[in-house]
Amino acid sequence: MSNVLVVAGHEFSRLARSPLVIFVVVIICLSTVINAAGCSVLLHKIDDVAAEPFMSGIGNLFYFSSIFFSFLALCMGIMVVSGDRSVGALRVLVTKPLHGRDIIAGKLLGMNALLLALVTLFVALGAASLAVSYGMPHDSGETALKLIIFGAGLFLFCALVTVLTTFLGVVFRELVSVLAISVSFLVIAWFARLQYVYAAVGKFELVNPVVQYVRLSAPVAGCDIFNPYADQFIFSAWFAAALPFAMLVVAEIGMLFAASCLLFKDEEK
């Protein structure tokens, strides 16, 4: 376990100092400020008809933040295995007294710890800037719960993307191949959310990780955490409807992580 934490700490600090993450923090700050400025006018227009306009303002950031963070997670996942392999850094780690599973687990732990910090920063800044520009939510407790659900769902989706790209980095040795497959998969996953694609594939759309992620926020009609016109948010109803999707995402993360560790262990031999 100590070896995993050492690798995780190194990966966290290495990625945190990268220009990519600095760029991300700048984009996070700009997007929350721009959204708050727009919502300061927009949300007051629906005050009379909306039960809780505050979450509608957060919902404006949903697709932007989801696509943005998923591509950030993809870049990180490619960097930590395929990128390191392309410059020979993995060969240095393998010569150390480390098991293959320690390297993969440590890299994923450090990477996802940084993503968790960035997601938390994004949600906190988004809520704080909205509270300053528009005002406090009508029900602070319910809004806080919805913000936690949004942040947790976004982090789970990012974790799934990182473990998927790590798995691809272990399977395919060429950086270009991993980059092409990962980007293509993510673009297709988001593109498949279009209505005419759903009409063609029907229930098979549920295998799409983007669909699984979106269903965490709105698992069934009436349980959308961003719906400003809902009179009451019933947590038990949301939990019962969203739990299968959350378990599916966690199971996918676990299976891809286990497969990555096993395959990388074979490479070590």
Each PLM stretch: what is its role?
Residues 73-77, 90, 125, 164, ...:
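Hydrophobic/aromatic residues in alpha-helical transmembrane segments
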Residues 14, 82, 93-95, 165, ...:
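Helix-capping/transition residues at the boundaries of transmembrane alpha-helices
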Residues 265-269:
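Short cytosolic juxtamembrane segments of multi-pass membrane proteins
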Residues 1-28:
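Aromatic- and glycine-rich beta-strand/loop motifs that create alpha-glucan
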